[in-house]
Amino acid sequence: MDVDKLIEAGKIAKKVREEAVKLAKPGVSLLELAEKIESRIVELGGKPAFPANLSLNEVAAHYTPYKGDQTVLKEGDYLKIDLGVHIDGYIADTAVTVRVGMDFDELMEAAKEALESAISVARAGVEVKELGKAIENEIRKRGFNPIVNLSGHKIERYKLHAGVSIPNIYRPHDNYVLQEGDVFAIEPFATTGAGQVIEVPPTLIYMYVRDAPVRMAQARFLLAKIKREYKTLPFAYRWLQGEMPEGQLKLALRSLERSGALYGYPVLREIRGGMVTQFEHTIIVEKDSVTVTTE
């Protein structure tokens, strides 16, 4: 593990997150904001570890704009900005919620305090369910619900989701014990809704999983490009727009997804249409505490 690269990725992620918050004003287009976030990451010496996720209101995650997207920010929107930076595969993952044109409110505070509470109990030897308990308590005591089917995640080199989850609720069977040197993203989501997300179209983010035989020449071309440029990290539909006509691109991606070569991440929406907030940091677990790389 290269701690220096993890720390540097975290510094870039923090800076870009803070700049993105200042840019999130009424009338700004999601496309413009996403492109600024991603190009700024590169300017500062990193690469996007995944597409900028810009999810509004009842959409909790996995929305990234496409070329031609007309969505603009409106006053009162809850905008989740979730961005990732990697240096040589060493990842920092961070998120913040902005209430566009308005002040910080209780729903935002619930997710932010939940994150801080979870970080304060994290250290080597602690079971992840204790972090889930801390998150759930902070959100529920403010009268909101944690989103039960979204969670934080272990991070490894070139692997955004490395198999272990940090739940946003207390679950007795979540007994993975944090180890010194583990890298985790902790990301509480709070909602005014039921506390559950469902998958809805469209799918705007994909990830390479494995090689698989596909007939379509365009699909083979696309797969080679994806492996070369993004390796095992998520990428945006938008990043491939312009590679071939739109209809062919959609067909090629569908064919690659069906074959198991790619995994698609549909947009995630709160099941009852409740408003959703999110805050996230990346931590390196130490013996008696953690290092927060994105703070």
From Swiss-Prot:
Transmembrane segments: none
Cofactor(s) needed by this chain: Co(2+); Zn(2+); Mn(2+); Fe(2+)
Binding residues for a divalent metal cation 1: 82, 93, 280
Record-linked Gene3D superfamilies: Creatinase/methionine aminopeptidase superfamily, Winged helix-like DNA-binding domain superfamily/Winged helix DNA-binding domain
Biological processes, Gene Ontology terms: proteolysis
Source superkingdom: Archaea
Enzyme class (EC, first level): hydrolase
Details of cofactor binding: Binds 2 divalent metal cations per subunit. Has a high-affinity and a low affinity metal-binding site. The true nature of the physiological cofactor is under debate. The enzyme is active with cobalt, zinc, manganese or divalent iron ions. Most likely, methionine aminopeptidases function as mononuclear Fe(2+)-metalloproteases under physiological conditions, and the catalytically relevant metal-binding site has been assigned to the histidine-containing high-affinity site.
PROSITE patterns linked: MAP_2 (PS01202)
S-S bridge residues: none
Record keywords, A-Z: Aminopeptidase, Hydrolase, Metal-binding, Protease
Residues that coordinate or bind substrate: 62, 161
One Pfam short name: Peptidase_M24
Any Gene Ontology CC annotation: cytoplasm
Catalytic activity line of the entry: Release of N-terminal amino acids, preferentially methionine, from peptides and arylamides
Function: Removes the N-terminal methionine from nascent proteins. The N-terminal methionine is often cleaved when the second residue in the primary sequence is small and uncharged (Met-Ala-, Cys, Gly, Pro, Ser, Thr, or Val).
Subunit structure, as described in the record: Monomer.
HAMAP family: MetAP_2_arc
Protein name, per record: Methionine aminopeptidase
Source organism of this protein record: Pyrococcus horikoshii (strain ATCC 700860 / DSM 12428 / JCM 9974 / NBRC 100139 / OT-3)
Organism taxonomic ancestry: Archaea, Methanobacteriati, Methanobacteriota, Thermococci, Thermococcales
